[in-house]
Amino acid sequence: MKKAVCIMSGGMDSTLCAVMAKREGYEIIALHFDYEQRTMRREKMAFEQICDYLGIKKRLNLDVSFIADIGGNALTDKNLAVSKSGLGDEIPNTYVPFRNGIFISIAAALAEKEGAQAIYIGVVEEDSSGYPDCKGEFIERMNAAINVGTAPETKIKIVTPLVNLSKADIVAKSLEFGSPLELTWSCYEREDEACGLCDSCRLRLRGFERAGVKDKIKYANLS
């Protein structure tokens, strides 16, 4: 059976990617990262619940806390306030330097070891105005580097099925494919209830609103 490493944060995008990979007939190897982010425990809980829901047996939760040691972002540095400035073109302080590059590199090592043919990652161009490691060009070049830097018989494709979708499209497709949106977690700041104010919450809420669907998770603030 063909295999895919799915990088899964516990959020709605990566969850839909895993659902889509499963529909494509892949055996899923779920990969989650703990990097001392503010909502690390809540994201890990979402990851485990989603894997249970999807019947994913092979799952790996890796400690990459060196990312917090590098610092420079509000997700790991509690001295920085999480950006609530809006969804503009500037790189926000929630950008974790080269995070997707680090994650993809580790996923490539796992894929090579497991003999997997694909890496699924839920990057979305709509998010990429401020996140350079979400852009299609970045993914293409990472894919080329992986296939140069692995054994000759290793052929891995990075699959980004959501890259050209809007958040509303992602909500609609999640409902169409039976992705468990109610188990996913997007908030950057809180673990009890989603804050409703951070940029990630606002992107999520805007997606549900434009899709004409109510989000079932609880929010502390709804404007």
UniProtKB/Swiss-Prot annotation:
One of its GO terms (molecular function) is ligase activity, forming carbon-nitrogen bonds. This is 7-cyano-7-deazaguanine synthase. The keyword S-adenosyl-L-methionine does not apply. The lineage of its organism: Bacteria, Pseudomonadati, Campylobacterota, Epsilonproteobacteria, Campylobacterales. Catalyzes the ATP-dependent conversion of 7-carboxy-7-deazaguanine (CDG) to 7-cyano-7-deazaguanine (preQ(0)). The gene is queC. ATP binds at M8, S9, G10, G11, M12, D13, S14, T15, L16, C17, A18. Binds 1 zinc ion per subunit. It catalyses: 7-carboxy-7-deazaguanine + NH4(+) + ATP = 7-cyano-7-deazaguanine + ADP + phosphate + H2O + H(+). InterPro entries: QueC, Rossmann-like_a/b/a_fold. One of its GO terms (biological process) is queuosine biosynthetic process.
